Amino acid sequence: MPIDNLPPLREVINAYGLQANKSLGQNFLFDLNLTSKIARQAGNIEGKPVIEIGPGPGGLTRALLAKGAIVTVIERDKRCLPALLEIEKHYPKKLNLIFDDALKQDLSKLSETYPEKPRIIANLPYNIGTQLLLNWLLTTSWPPFYESMTLMFQREVAKRITATPQSPHYSRLSVLAGWRTIAKIAFDVPPQAFIPAPKVTSSVINIIPRPQPLACSVQKLSLVTKVAFGEKRKMLRQSLKTIGGKELLEKAGIDETRRAETLLIPEFITLANLMT
């Protein structure tokens, strides 16, 4: 069942010659039922501001607009302009187009133009998805500029974002995400849902900011997690050697023979807060 009166995405992609650009990390979703499922994950978005990164030909964009959202898309590939302009005509005053590199955009300033905090909903380009997420997790002010995030990543990345201590995917990204947010995998998306089909399964995750995360310096927690997981197979007394090693661990009351993958998030916070 169509979500609007616009052409099917396969026709749009063919009509405008939109072959996915590997260097931009593009994989286009073409199943509008699936894009609608992603839009539903964000809850009631009718009349709500939404920011989408990397819309491509606009499959998810159409699903968000069909749900009544006020959407701003950020796209650096100008080949997508004609397809997005067609959507803009269909949804007058509901779609704002920004053609730029998402890594160069200050979304916190953009959000100040909205009457309420936006939701970020996106099938993120694979090559910049993790960096974008880190930028949004490590904002200077908290609570952040966004209400929630519903994002698609490669499944391996999604597992690292949502992993818990002692699990094989527990990583620096798990700690930084778990410190300030609650992140959960909603569902998986098979490779055949994309054009072109990637070699891996993708996952949609929901991320909700914690209103009052444990107090900690962003810079210090970034550093302690970077060095700890940089040599995660080593004991902490060795992996943390450059930032205090045994002395820091003793102050924190943490066994120096443990490894990064065993530490709880509050223990990483303690280490960061004790750094000089």
Swiss-Prot record:
SMART domains: rADc (SM00650). Keywords: Cytoplasm, Methyltransferase, RNA-binding, rRNA processing, S-adenosyl-L-methionine, Transferase. Its main location: cytoplasm. InterPro entries: KsgA/Erm, rRNA_Ade_diMease-like_C, rRNA_Ade_Mease_Trfase_CS, rRNA_Ade_methylase_Trfase_N, rRNA_adenine_dimethylase, SAM-dependent_MTases_sf. One of its GO terms (molecular function) is RNA binding. It is found in: Cytoplasm. GO terms for cellular component: cytosol. The keyword S-adenosyl-L-methionine applies. Disulfide bonds: none annotated. It catalyses: adenosine(1518)/adenosine(1519) in 16S rRNA + 4 S-adenosyl-L-methionine = N(6)-dimethyladenosine(1518)/N(6)-dimethyladenosine(1519) in 16S rRNA + 4 S-adenosyl-L-homocysteine + 4 H(+). Its EC number is 2.1.1.182. S-adenosyl-L-methionine binds at N27, L29, G54, E75, D101, N123. Specifically dimethylates two adjacent adenosines (A1518 and A1519) in the loop of a conserved hairpin near the 3'-end of 16S rRNA in the 30S particle. May play a critical role in biogenesis of 30S subunits. Belongs to the class I-like SAM-binding methyltransferase superfamily. rRNA adenine N(6)-methyltransferase family. RsmA subfamily. NCBIfam families: ksgA. This is Ribosomal RNA small subunit methyltransferase A. It comes from Bartonella bacilliformis (strain ATCC 35685 / KC583 / Herrer 020/F12,63). The lineage of its organism: Bacteria, Pseudomonadati, Pseudomonadota, Alphaproteobacteria, Hyphomicrobiales. The gene is rsmA.
